[in-house]
């Protein structure tokens, strides 16, 4: 049986840092999610990651994608994984300790 966690993962990939910051700000204001971090993918692409309950992550990613589009054509992709497999957890950045 595959091991899964109950916390959803939301991802937004952008062209450039400004849309990424705008998306992160909108996501954390729109819903009860935790900003896990950001990854500089290369070529100017930045991915922002949030965690939380599935409904909250869904609302946050929608808000982040909308905010990102308002600052130009920075949105590359937006995606949610409702229940992340434990093997995938190993490659994700760790959330900062509170």
Swiss-Prot record:
Coiled coil: none annotated. The keyword Ribosomal protein does not apply. Disruption phenotype: Required for growth in ambient air. One of its GO terms (biological process) is carbon fixation. It is found in: Carboxysome. Residues 8-93 form the BMC domain. InterPro entries: Bact_microcomp_CS, BMC_dom, BMC_shell, CcmK-like_sf, CcmK/CsoS1_BMC. It comes from the Bacteria. Keywords: Bacterial microcompartment, Carbon dioxide fixation, Carboxysome. SUPFAM superfamilies: CcmK-like. It holds the Pfam family BMC. One of its GO terms (cellular component) is carboxysome. The keyword Metal-binding does not apply. Its main location: other. Expression of 10 genes for alpha-carboxysome (Cb) proteins (cbbL-cbbS-csoS2-csoS3-csoS4A-csoS4B-csoS1C-csoS1A-csoS1B-csoS1D) in E.coli generates compartments that resemble Cb, contain RuBisCO and have its catalytic activity, showing it is possible to make artificial, functional Cb using these 10 genes. Cargo proteins can be targeted to these organelles. Artificial Cb assembly in E.coli requires csoS2-csoS4A-csoS4B-csoS1C-csoS1A-csoS1B-csoS1D (but not the gene for carbonic anhydrase, csoS3). Homohexamer with a small central pore. Interacts with the N-terminus (residues 1-136) of RuBisCO (CbbL). Belongs to the bacterial microcompartments protein family. CsoS1 subfamily. The tight homohexamer forms a pore with an opening of about 2 Angstroms in diameter which is positively charged. One of shell proteins of the carboxysome, a polyhedral inclusion where RuBisCO (ribulose bisphosphate carboxylase, ccbL-ccbS) is sequestered. Assembles into hexamers which make sheets that form the facets of the polyhedral carboxysome. The shell probably limits the diffusion of CO(2) into and out of the carboxysome. There are estimated to be 2970 CsoS1A/CsoS1C proteins per carboxysome (the proteins differ by only 1 residue). This is Carboxysome shell protein CsoS1C.
């Amino acid at each position: 049986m595959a091991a899964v966690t109950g916390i959803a993962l939301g991802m937004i990939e952008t062209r450039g840092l400004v849309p990424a910051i705008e998306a992160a700000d909108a996501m954390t204001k729109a819903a009860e999610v935790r900003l896990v971090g950001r990854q500089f993918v290369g070529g100017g692409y930045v991915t922002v990651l949030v965690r939380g309950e599935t409904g909250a992550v869904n609302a946050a990613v929608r808000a982040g994608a909308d905010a990102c589009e308002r600052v130009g054509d920075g949105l590359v992709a937006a995606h949610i994984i409702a229940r992340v497999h434990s093997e995938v957890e190993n490659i994700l950045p760790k959330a900062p300790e509170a």
